[in-house]
Amino acid sequence: MIKVVLVDDQTLVRQGVKSLLSLAESIEVVAEASDGQHAIDLIPGIKPDVVLMDMRMPVKSGLEAIQELAALKALPPTIILTTFDDDELVLAGIKAGAKGYLLKDVSLEQLVEAIQVVSKGGSLVQPVMTQRLLSGL
């Protein structure tokens, strides 16, 4: 069972993602956080296999949370799950230590695949984002 922590400031999004992930037999949502600071306080004690992290949140952003958890050597494999398809955010997230970047319009199958890949040490950026990043080189 892959233990996942959801971090998103929107309650409805957290509840929806949790509900969808409950359909995947290999994944269990073990905790939720509503902002980056809450994630920083929560994650080291839980030690999840994967974190799904929104980028833009109050108190501390997802990027700030990733950076702080990495500095504490407490960053689990993290997938950024956001509505923002900004190339600079993608690169900043990956540079900070995220192992994946997905937009919130992904299918359940794509999300489950990303969680499985990242939990095994891999990385995954949504194909549309990868194509844009590579075309910009």
Q: What are these regions, as identified by a protein language model?
A:
Residues 46-52:
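Active-site beta3 strand of CheY-like receiver
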Residues 44-46, 68-75, 96:
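Conserved phosphotransfer cores of two-component systems
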Residues 26-34, 42:
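Short hydrophobic/Thr-rich beta-strand motif most characteristic of the beta2 strand and flanking loop
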Residues 1-13, 17-21:
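Conserved acidic segment of CheY-like receiver
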Residues 35-38, 61-64:
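Acidic catalytic/metal-coordinating carboxylates
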Residues 88-95, 99-100, 105-137:
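Short, flexible helix-to-coil linker/hinge segments that flank and couple to helix-turn-helix
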Residues 57:
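Receiver (REC) domain active-site loop signature in two-component systems and cognate sites
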Residues 8, 54, 82:
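Active-site residues of response regulator receiver
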